[in-house]
Structure formats: C-alpha cells, structure tokens
C-alpha cells in the first residue's frame, strides 16, 4: 500500500508542477504580448516564479520517497 501511495504522490506532484510552470509561462507570454516594453521585468519574474513553483513538487517527491523507506 505504501508503494501505491508513493506512486500517486509522485505522479500528482509531477502533474501539478507541469501545470504550474505552464500557467506561469502562459502569463509571461500574455504580458509580453500586451506590453512588450516590460519583457525584461516579466522574464525576471518568470525566472523567479518557475523555481518556486517547482519547489513544492520536488518536496512532494522527496516525501513520497521517504514513505517508501
């Protein structure tokens, strides 16, 4: 049962991370399209936001590995 729980946690974490990154990149592209002069600022915020969005799934995967061992 622990294997199933770890697999579900890791899978959901991966999907959630991918969706979060897609939303951040989509918002950056839309913002750049609306105001091209803010491209540098939006890109900087994206480069900060993507690792923050990826941190939670990485922590969830580590916790799912801890469930196994």
Curated annotation (Swiss-Prot):
Question: Which PROSITE patterns does the protein's record reference?
Answer: ATPASE_C (PS00605)
List the coiled-coil residues: none
- Location relative to the cell: Cell membrane
Q: Where is this site: Reversibly protonated during proton transport?
A: 54
Could you tell me which Pfam families the record lists for this protein?
Answer: ATP-synt_C
What's in the GO CC field?
A: plasma membrane; proton-transporting ATP synthase complex; proton-transporting two-sector ATPase complex, proton-transporting domain
- Extract the InterPro entries matched here: ATP_synth_csu_bac/chlpt, ATP_synth_F0_csu, ATP_synth_F0_csu_DDCD_BS, ATP_synth_F0_csu_sf, ATPase_proteolipid_c-like_dom, F/V-ATP_Csub_sf
For molecular function, the Gene Ontology terms on record are: lipid binding; proton-transporting ATP synthase activity, rotational mechanism
Record's superkingdom?
Bacteria
Q: How does it sit in the membrane?
A: Multi-pass membrane protein
Q: Which keywords does this Swiss-Prot/TrEMBL entry list? A: ATP synthesis, Cell membrane, CF(0), Hydrogen ion transport, Ion transport, Lipid-binding, Membrane, Transmembrane, Transmembrane helix, Transport
Where's it mainly located? membrane
Gene3D superfamilies membership? F1F0 ATP synthase subunit C (1.20.20.10)
The residue ranges crossing the membrane are 5-25, 47-67
What assembly does the database describe for this protein?
Answer: F-type ATPases have 2 components, F(1) - the catalytic core - and F(0) - the membrane proton channel. F(1) has five subunits: alpha(3), beta(3), gamma(1), delta(1), epsilon(1). F(0) has three main subunits: a(1), b(2) and c(10-14). The alpha and beta chains form an alternating ring which encloses part of the gamma chain. F(1) is attached to F(0) by a central stalk formed by the gamma and epsilon chains, while a peripheral stalk is formed by the delta and b chains.
Provide the family line. Belongs to the ATPase C chain family.
Q: What does this protein do?
A: F(1)F(0) ATP synthase produces ATP from ADP in the presence of a proton or sodium gradient. F-type ATPases consist of two structural domains, F(1) containing the extramembraneous catalytic core and F(0) containing the membrane proton channel, linked together by a central stalk and a peripheral stalk. During catalysis, ATP synthesis in the catalytic domain of F(1) is coupled via a rotary mechanism of the central stalk subunits to proton translocation.
What is the protein's given name?
ATP synthase subunit c
From the broadest rank down, the organism's phylogenetic lineage runs:
Bacteria, Bacillati, Bacillota, Bacilli, Bacillales
Gene coding for it: atpE
């Amino acid at each position: 049962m622990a294997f199933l729980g770890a697999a579900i946690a890791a899978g959901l974490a991966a999907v959630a991370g991918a969706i979060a990154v897609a939303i951040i990149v989509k918002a950056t592209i839309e913002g750049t399209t609306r105001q091209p002069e803010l491209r540098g600022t939006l890109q900087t915020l994206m480069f900060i936001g993507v690792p923050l969005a990826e941190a939670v799934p990485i922590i969830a995967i580590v916790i799912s590995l801890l469930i196994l061992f």
